[in-house]
């Protein structure tokens, strides 16, 4: 039996607020310890990330993206199935130019509804084709400066 709708809704709101706050601790605050994150489409070949993987990635990524804004366009919450979908636009400034992306995020709640247990996220493929090489180049060119963040 799924968790009560109001518990899931509160968790969903905390997830959105954590994302909007754009800090690693805030964004991960209501992820379960066994939460996984999968980048979509599946054909992108990006490996499944564990919470531990994300705890290493987010501080680096978030440190490179300033003036982050989140604009939520749609939220669909299917309480009987224990899941939700968020469609959002994000913007940020990076050392290598502006970042603008669209996200469709699919969330699954844990049994009691107080944590997000599974995430699947679809990004705008056109944006990512342009952004990822710039990100990779910046990280490679600044490895010494960013080194401590990668440990």
From Swiss-Prot:
InterPro entries xref list: Fungal_Meroterpenoid_Isomerase (IPR050977), NTF2-like_dom_sf (IPR032710)
Which Enzyme Commission number(s) are on file for it?
1.-.-.-
Q: If you read the UniProt record, what top EC class would you report for this enzyme, in one word?
A: oxidoreductase
Domain of life according to the entry: Eukaryota
Q: Which UniProt keywords apply?
A: Monooxygenase, Oxidoreductase
- Coiled-coil annotation reads none
Q: Which GO terms describe its molecular function?
A: monooxygenase activity
What protein family does this chain belong to? Belongs to the avfA family.
- Quote the function comment for this protein: Monooxygenase; part of the gene cluster that mediates the biosynthesis of the tetrahydroxanthone dimer neosartorin, which exhibits antibacterial activity. The two different monomeric units appear to be synthesized by the same set of enzymes, among which the Baeyer-Villiger monooxygenase nsrF is the key enzyme for the divergence of the biosynthetic routes. The pathway begins with the synthesis of atrochrysone thioester by the polyketide synthase nsrB. The atrochrysone carboxyl ACP thioesterase nsrC then breaks the thioester bond and releases the atrochrysone carboxylic acid from AacuL.
Q: Which PANTHER family match?
A: AUSTINOID BIOSYNTHESIS CLUSTERS PROTEIN F-RELATED, AUSTINOL SYNTHESIS PROTEIN F-RELATED
Question: Which protein is depicted?
Answer: Monooxygenase nsrQ
Native source organism of the sequence: Aspergillus novofumigatus (strain IBT 16806)
Give the lineage: Eukaryota, Fungi, Dikarya, Ascomycota, Pezizomycotina
């Amino acid at each position: 039996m799924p968790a009560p709708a109001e518990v899931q809704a509160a968790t969903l709101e905390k997830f959105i607020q954590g994302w909007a706050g754009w800090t690693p601790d805030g964004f991960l605050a209501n992820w379960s310890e066994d939460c996984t994150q999968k980048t979509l489409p599946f054909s992108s070949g990006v490996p499944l990330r564990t919470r531990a993987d994300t705890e290493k990635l987010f501080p680096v990524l978030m440190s490179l993206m300033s003036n982050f804004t989140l604009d939520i366009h749609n939220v669909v919450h299917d309480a009987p199935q224990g899941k939700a979908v968020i469609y959002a636009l994000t913007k940020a400034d990076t050392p290598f130019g502006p970042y603008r992306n669209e996200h469709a995020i699919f969330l699954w709640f844990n049994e009691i509804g107080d944590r997000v247990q599974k995430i699947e996220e679809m990004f705008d493929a056109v944006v990512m084709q342009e952004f990822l090489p710039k990100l990779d180049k910046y990280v490679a060119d600044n490895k010494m400066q960013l080194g401590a963040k990668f440990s």
